[in-house]
């Protein structure tokens, strides 16, 4: 029987890293992606089941390229866990539109780029799981979260909308 494979974006820290270690301990092939190659290397060097694939999710073409590399390496992907995120806390007096746009580029559009990279694969396979990590900040305003909260709220809406689109597959 072939080992199962999971691809985790945001896999170098936080929830993504913890999940990578957990799945690897269960014998899964774990592909992790993040911008910081040194952290990917550190994690993969300490676990033979974890493999780093450097990625900036704001690059749509690179998302597809990395997913294709993962498919080629492991022959199949069973779960995609998209946990990429950035937070740039700001008080209302310090709100900078460009910084909020940068947060959206990573948190929302980076996740959307990742979904678009795997969409056809999972539709054709008719099997698999795509998980999007959000935050309580996506449901309720929190202090200093003028960019982060709205970007996660957009992810919540995206996930709910895609559920209806993808469930027929």
Language-model features: where?
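Conserved glycine-rich cofactor-binding loop
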Residues: 12-13
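Conserved glycine-rich Rossmann-like NAD(P)H-binding loop of the short-chain dehydrogenase/reductase
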Residues: 26-43
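The beta1-alpha1 cofactor-binding region of Rossmann-like NAD(H)/NADP(H)-dependent oxidoreductases
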Residues: 55-65, 97
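Substrate-binding pocket helix/loop in short-chain dehydrogenase/reductase
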Residues: 91-92, 96-104
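Active-site loop immediately N-terminal to the catalytic Tyr-X3-Lys motif
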Residues: 93, 140-146
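Active-site helix of classical SDR
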Residues: 115, 151
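Residue(s) in the substrate-gating loop at a strand-loop-helix junction
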Residues: 135
């Amino acid at each position: 029987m072939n080992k199962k494979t999971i691809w985790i974006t945001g896999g170098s820290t936080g929830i993504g890293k913890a999940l990578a270690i957990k799945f690897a301990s269960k014998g899964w092939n774990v592909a992790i992606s993040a911008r910081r190659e040194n952290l990917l290397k550190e994690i993969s060097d300490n676990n033979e089941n974890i493999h780093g694939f450097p990625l900036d999710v704001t690059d749509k073409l690179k998302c597809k390229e990395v997913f294709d590399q993962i498919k080629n390496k492991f022959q199949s992907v069973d779960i995609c866990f998209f946990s990429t995120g950035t937070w740039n806390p700001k008080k209302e007096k310090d709100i900078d539109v460009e910084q909020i746009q940068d947060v959206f580029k990573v948190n929302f559009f980076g996740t959307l780029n990742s979904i678009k990279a795997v969409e056809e694969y999972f539709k054709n396979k008719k099997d698999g799981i795509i998980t999007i990590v959000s935050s309580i900040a996506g449901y309720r305003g929190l202090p200093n979260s003028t960019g982060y909260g709205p970007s996660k709220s957009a992810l919540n809406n995206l996930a709910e909308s895609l559920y209806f689109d993808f469930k027929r597959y």
